[in-house]
C-alpha cells in the first residue's frame, strides 16, 4: 500500500480529484468573505456540470461549454442573491432550497434536451484539453502531476493567484471583507453592502461553475446524475478549515482530494469493504468541521 501512496499515479489522481473541491472551496471563500453563506455551491456545481456538458456537445466547443457552465453557476448564485439579499430570506435555507431545485432541474434539462435516448440521466460533453509542458513533465514524481494536467488545473492556479491579489491588494477586496466583517462601517462611507455581496456571489458562481465543468468536461467526459456527490459541501469544509486564507484552503482541499481518491483507489489495493471506504470523505469532513469549530470556540472564549 505504501508503494501505491508514494507512486506518481497516486499524486496525479489526488490532484485530479481535488480540483473540483478546490474550486468549490474558492467559491465558499469569496462568499464568506462578503458575509453571505452560499450553501448552494453544491447545486450550482450540478447545474454548471450539466450545462457545460450539453452546450459543449451541441456547440462542439469545450470553450463555449466552459463559459456557459460558469454562467450557469453565476445564475444559481443570482437566485441566492434574489432570495437572501432582495427578499431578505435566510441564506442558509435559501441555499438548501436551491440545492434541492438543482437536483431535479438537472435531470429535467437532460431529459428535455436529449428526449428519446435510452439513458436520460447522462449527457455527453466535449473534453477540456490537457496541457503538457515540455521537459518539465518529465521530472520524476511531480512532472506528470503538475506539468501534464488538464487546462482547468492551470486555471485553478491562476484563480488562486488572482484571489490572493484581489483580497489583499485591491479596493474591491477591501470592500468584500468590509461587507463581511464591518458592513455598518462600510455603509457609513458609501460602500453598498448589497452591491458588494452581489459581486462576491458572481465570483462565487463562476468558481462553482468551473468546479462543475471539471467534473463533466474534464474528469469523465459526460454528465451523470449525482456526479457532484457532496464535493460542494466538502469544499465548504475545506474553506472552513483554511479559515478564509486562499493557500491554506487549497491545501485542505488537496487533503480532502487525497481522501476522496483513497476511497476510490483503495478499493483495488486494500481488502476493506468498499462501502466503508466510500464513507471516508464524509467522515473526514465531519472531523475537519469538528476540529475547526473547537478551535474557533476556543479562540472566541479567550
Where on the chain are the PLM-derived regions?
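Transmembrane helix-bundle core of multi-pass membrane transporters
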Residues: 102-169, 270-277
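Single transmembrane alpha-helix segments in multi-pass membrane proteins
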Residues: 9-58, 62, 66, 71-92, ...
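Short loop segments and helix-boundary regions at transmembrane helix junctions
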Residues: 33-37, 78-133, 229-230, 234-247, ...
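Loop-to-transmembrane alpha-helix initiation sites
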Residues: 92-93, 119-123, 150-154, 197, ...
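Helix-loop-helix "hairpin" substructures at the membrane interface of multi-pass membrane proteins
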Residues: 145-223, 246-251
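Transmembrane alpha-helical segments in multi-pass inner-membrane proteins
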Residues: 208, 219-282
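Cytosolic-side transmembrane-helix boundaries in multi-pass membrane proteins
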Residues: 181-195, 266-302
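Hydrophobic core segments of alpha-helical transmembrane domains in multi-pass membrane transport
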Residues: 24-25, 49-53, 103-107, 153-166, ...
Amino acid at each position: 500500500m505504501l508503494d501505491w501512496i508514494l507512486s506518481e499515479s497516486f499524486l496525479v489522481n489526488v490532484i485530479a480529484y481535488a480540483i473540483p473541491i478546490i474550486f468549490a472551496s474558492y467559491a465558499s471563500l469569496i462568499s464568506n468573505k462578503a458575509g453571505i453563506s452560499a450553501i448552494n455551491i453544491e447545486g450550482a456545481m450540478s447545474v454548471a456540470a450539466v450545462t457545460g456538458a450539453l452546450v459543449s456537445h451541441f456547440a462542439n466547443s469545450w470553450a463555449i461549454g466552459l463559459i456557459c457552465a460558469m454562467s450557469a453557476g453565476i445564475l444559481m448564485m443570482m437566485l441566492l442573491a434574489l432570495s437572501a439579499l432582495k427578499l431578505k430570506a435566510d441564506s442558509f435555507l435559501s441555499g438548501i432550497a436551491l440545492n434541492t431545485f438543482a437536483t431535479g432541474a438537472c435531470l429535467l434539462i437532460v431529459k428535455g434536451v436529449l428526449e428519446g435516448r435510452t439513458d436520460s440521466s447522462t449527457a455527453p460533453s466535449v473534453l477540456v484539453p490537457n496541457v503538457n509542458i515540455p521537459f518539465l513533465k518529465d521530472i520524476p514524481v511531480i512532472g506528470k502531476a503538475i506539468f501534464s494536467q488538464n487546462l482547468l488545473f492551470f486555471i485553478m492556479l491562476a484563480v488562486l493567484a488572482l484571489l490572493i491579489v484581489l483580497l489583499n491588494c485591491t479596493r474591491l477586496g477591501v470592500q468584500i471583507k468590509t461587507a463581511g466583517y464591518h458592513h455598518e462601517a462600510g455603509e457609513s462611507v458609501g460602500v453598498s453592502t448589497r452591491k458588494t455581496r452581489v459581486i462576491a456571489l458572481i465570483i462565487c458562481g463562476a468558481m462553482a461553475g468551473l468546479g462543475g465543468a471539471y467534473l463533466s468536461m474534464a474528469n469523465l467526459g459526460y454528465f451523470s446524475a449525482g456526479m457532484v456527490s457532496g464535493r460542494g459541501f466538502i469544499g465548504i469544509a475545506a474553506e472552513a478549515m483554511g479559515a478564509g486564507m486562499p493557500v491554506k484552503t487549497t491545501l485542505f482541499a488537496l487533503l480532502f482530494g487525497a481522501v476522496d481518491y483513497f476511497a476510490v483507489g483503495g478499493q483495488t489495493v486494500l481488502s476493506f469493504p468498499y462501502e466503508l471506504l466510500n464513507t471516508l470523505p464524509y467522515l473526514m469532513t465531519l472531523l475537519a468541521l469538528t476540529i475547526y469549530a473547537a478551535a474557533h470556540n476556543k479562540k472566541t472564549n479567550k
